[in-house]
Curated annotation (Swiss-Prot):
Belongs to the glycosyltransferase group 1 family. This is Poly(ribitol-phosphate) alpha-N-acetylglucosaminyltransferase. Pathway: Cell wall biogenesis; poly(ribitol phosphate) teichoic acid biosynthesis. Changing R326A: Loss of activity. InterPro entries: Glyco_trans_1. Its EC number is 2.4.1.70. Homotrimer. It holds the Pfam family Glycos_transf_1. Keywords: Cell wall biogenesis/degradation, Cytoplasm, Glycosyltransferase, Teichoic acid biosynthesis, Transferase. It comes from Staphylococcus aureus (strain COL). The gene is tarM. UDP-N-acetyl-alpha-D-glucosamine binds at residues 17, 59, 249, 326, 331, 383, 403-411.
């Protein structure tokens, strides 16, 4: 029986895009009676709560499991020990003896030596979490992190107050992994699996060992690496029979064009395509570009699975233009604000609702203020219910400069919301038929984009017609059956 392991650095409740596509893929494979689970390599003390939240929100299928390198060794340690490590908690409490507590605010206290007045510790508590920082010569030297009053991690700090060493503890308080951290760049150095008495050169070596333990070396074992940073972990295992695939979810070009510079991680995946079973990209245009740019053959086009949900029952007549994405430079939300300015000058009734978080949010907020657009452009923050937000939009706009596919645009079209997007690599031209189910705009032509938005917000019949055709096109182009068939053909080839 086939079993699929999909790899990514981390999972979290506020991850979209690639993570959502992995969740959808897992569900579709499970529906086809092929277990498809997710493997992560980061450390989170609250992963149990994160997985519960993802499943409760309906993002992650109830059948999908998450395997994690730290959880694996933690469980071994849990099974090895029967009693709590009382010495650990005694060690911590002894350091707080003979101190004076000064409460700074609710849940925050500082501790001073009762004899010398020396600053000893800082404690911050919340409902379920607590941290204790210990100081020496007024400099932080250690932090103990607790969840539900149990220590799960200790961090050691250098003289510059940067983490240089970490220790991880099991449910009973016993250390199971410790590792050196490069204080300058955060890179993981020598790692010690205390529970197994093993030493590893770095995090890569540890994760390779873990994958070899987790995944049986059989043709029915299928590894799909979605996270580009995790690819070396899969690539370097000694599996001879298990299948290995890399997936590229983004444009592989370094810049907003195709001048020849490539992203380092994606380039590494592509250059090693012939040494694994294959590399998957999401659009045929990207596959053809890669074949022209690199001396490789094992490149395949398979779209993300698209979740076809019911269309909204009502058509939005209010003049609301929507946008949902990470607020990062590649999305060029600054251009969206310039478009909004042009639109509002001609029709002050139009509103722009922008959902997302990211590094450029403060810059965008200032642009909105500087252009006096506060009554028309609204930053709504991160949303856990994008489909509900789509129901409020009359149309969706994208100023993104490059995509792997453009899943958020596809989701809008499923909801019968026409999309106005710059014609960039890769994605929009695959599913937007200009002047039939949306508009493809010459990149950076903000005047044309503004004009097309005005046409749609002021013509209910046209917007509804485009929206209906958009949904029909997506359902026809991205059927679950055809996408699943491509994967199965690849596995069986």
């Amino acid at each position: 029986m086939k079993k699929i392991f999909m790899m990514v650095h981390e999972l979290d409740v506020n991850k979209g895009g690639m993570t959502s596509s992995m969740f959808n893929r897992s569900k579709e494979f499970y529906d086809a009676d092929i277990p498809a689970d997710i493997v992560t390599f980061d450390y989170k003390g609250n992963y149990d709560e994160i997985i519960k939240a993802l499943k409760k929100q309906g993002k992650m299928d109830r059948r999908t499991k998450m395997y994690n390198v730290f959880e694996y060794f933690k469980q071994i340690s849990n099974n090895k020990h029967f009693k709590s490590n009382k010495l650990l908690y005694k060690h911590i409490s002894e350091r707080l003896k003979n101190t004076i507590e000064i409460e700074e605010s609710k849940g925050i206290s500082r501790y001073f030596d009762i004899t010398t007045g020396t600053y000893i510790a800082y404690i911050r508590k919340s409902k379920s979490e607590k941290v204790i920082d210990f100081f020496k010569d007024n400099k932080r030297i250690e932090r103990f992190s607790f969840i539900d009053n149990k220590v799960h991690m200790k961090e050691t700090f250098n003289v510059d107050n940067k983490v240089c060493y970490q220790v991880f503890y099991d449910e009973k308080g016993y250390p199971y992994i410790s590792r050196n951290i490069n204080a300058n760049n955060g890179a993981v150095g020598k790692t010690y699996v205390l529970v197994n008495k093993k030493e590893f050169k770095n995090n890569l070596a540890l994760c390779v060992y873990y994958l070899e333990k987790l995944i049986k070396d059989s043709k029915d074992s299928i590894m799909i690496c979605d996270g580009p940073g995790s690819f070396p972990k899969m690539f370097n295992t000694n599996h001879k029979n298990a299948q290995k695939y890399g997936v590229i979810h983004v444009n592989h070009h370094e810049n907003f064009d195709d001048t020849g510079a490539f992203k380092k991680s994606e380039k590494y995946i592509i250059e090693n395509a012939n040494k694994i079973n294959g590399v998957i990209v999401l659009t045929e245009a990207q596959r053809l570009d890669i074949l022209n740019q690199f001396d490789v053959e094992n490149i395949f086009t398979i779209s993300n699975f698209v979740k076809i949900h019911n269309a909204p029952k009502h058509f939005q007549t209010e003049k609301i233009v929507g946008h949902i994405s990470r607020m990062v430079p590649t999305k060029r939300i600054d251009l969206l604000i310039e478009v909004a300015e042009l639109v509002v000058k001609k029709d002050n009734a139009v509103k722009f609702h922008i959902y997302g978080e990211g590094s450029v949010k403060d810059k965008i907020a200032k642009m909105i203020e500087d252009k006096n657009l506060e009554r028309n452009v609204f930053l709504k923050g991160y949303t856990t219910t994008p489909q509900k937000c789509l129901e409020d939009f009359k149309l969706v706009v994208s100023t993104s400069q490059y995509e792997g596919q453009g899943l958020s645009m596809i989701e809008a079209m499923i909801s019968k919301r026409p999309v106005v997007a710059f014609d960039i690599k890769y994605g929009p031209s695959d599913f937007i038929e200009d002047n039939k189910n949306g508009y493809l705009i010459e990149n950076h032509n903000i005047n044309d984009m503004a004009d097309k938005i005005l046409q749609l917000v002021n013509n209910d019949v046209l917007a509804a017609e485009f929206g209906s055709k958009a949904r029909e096109n997506i359902i026809e182009k991205y059927s679950t059956e055809s996408i699943l068939e491509k994967w199965l053909n690849l596995f069986n080839s």
